[in-house]
Curated annotation (Swiss-Prot):
Protein's name according to its UniProt entry: DNA-directed RNA polymerase subunit alpha
Subunit structure: In plastids the minimal PEP RNA polymerase catalytic core is composed of four subunits: alpha, beta, beta', and beta''. When a (nuclear-encoded) sigma factor is associated with the core the holoenzyme is formed, which can initiate transcription.
Domain of life: Eukaryota
Primary location: plastid
Reactions it catalyzes: RNA(n) + a ribonucleoside 5'-triphosphate = RNA(n+1) + diphosphate
SMART domains reported for this sequence: RPOLD (SM00662)
């Protein structure tokens, strides 16, 4: 088990794994923190992340079993201790890991007597078993057991219905494609008054097909993919093709206008006005904050060349900043 002391950054937004352990092959646990966050942000991120962790991450399951010797789901087979229904439930619990797209076939072909476990499943190279010891059936007599399996990668869950019984010898299996067993978030506040900030604690339990850290990365990518269209909407709605006629703000204009603004304002006043008191968009605010620009004085003493080196910062943001500063 890995466990670390929680150290909170006072400036740059950071995430960290503070605890990680494997309770068994099919139960992993991870605890993460994200800080510092402004009041209200931790709950927003925590709720969104939990929903994505539990509903959007893909998993791999056995979704169908087929055997010529099985008359119906609730029958028993001579020489097998478990009923057909129990065998199907055991197959449902098998935890798989894969980079599969769509479906594939697998096979169980065993001669008794003996125990049939997950390691007896013949799989394609793209699929692997997390726990080879998972029990499937007990053969009490020297019989041949042959079961064809269908394996699928998807998300959420798939509950069988009467309509899914298409073949008399083919039995659909309830599939739960969610590799994250549970996810919780909690919030700790610190600071006073307007300086109050939050720490987000995120706990993740997985079934072993991926680690909590991998689950967190996948959930983050899923959320990013959801929001990217909003970032592109402004460009796509412009009437000009490829936006080839966008006007950029010359560097010398930026410097000249900043110099005039600085002369008009007292240095003490500028140092006491924080950027979060201005009408900047959250994206611009976060970009500036990550670059240790906290007050208007810091901003007015930053060259445009340096601003444009900030990750995700654009020339349109410079125009917006100039417009805001001229109102001060």
């Amino acid at each position: 088990m890995v466990r670390e002391k929680v150290k909170v950054s006072t400036r740059t937004l950071q995430w960290k794994c503070v605890e990680s352990r494997a309770d068994s092959k099919r139960l992993y646990y991870g605890r993460f923190i994200l800080s510092p966050l402004m009041k209200g942000q931790a709950d927003t991120i925590g709720i969104a992340m939990r929903r994505v962790l539990l509903g959007e991450i893909e998993g791999t399951c056995i979704t169908r079993a087929k055997s010529e010797k099985i008359p119906h789901e609730y029958s028993t087979i001579v020489g097998i201790q478990e009923s057909v229904h129990e065998i199907l439930m055991n197959l449902k619990d098998i935890v798989l890991r894969s980079n599969l797209y769509g479906t594939c076939d697998a096979l169980i072909c065993v001669k008794g007597p003996g125990y049939v476990t997950a390691q007896d499943i013949l799989l394609p190279p793209s699929v692997e078993i997390v726990d080879n010891t998972q029990h499937i059936a007990s053969l009490t007599e020297p019989i041949d057991l042959s079961i064809g399996l269908q394996i699928e990668r998807s998300r959420g869950y798939n509950i069988k219905t009467p309509n899914t019984f298409q073949d008399g010898n083919c039995y659909p299996i309830d599939a739960v494609f969610m590799p994250v067993r549970n996810a919780n978030h909690s919030i700790q506040s610190y600071g006073n008054g307007n300086e109050k900030q939050e720490i987000l604690f995120l706990e993740i339990w997985t079934n072993g097909s991926l680690t909590p850290k991998e689950a967190l990365h996948e959930a983050s990518r899923s959320l990013i993919d959801l929001f990217i269209p909003f970032l592109q909407a402004e460009d796509e709605n412009l009437p000009l093709e490829n936006n080839q006629y966008k006007v950029t703000l010359p560097f010398f204009t930026f410097h000249d206008r900043l110099a005039k603004l600085t002369k008009k304002k007292k240095e003490i006043a500028l140092k006491s006005i924080f950027i979060d008191q201005s009408e900047m968009s959250p994206r611009i605010y976060n970009c500036l904050k990550k670059s240790n620009i906290h007050t208007l004085f810091d901003l007015l003493n930053t060259r445009q060349e340096d601003l444009m080196k900030i990750e995700h910062f654009r020339i349109e943001d410079v125009k917006q900043i100039m417009s805001i500063l001229e109102k001060k």
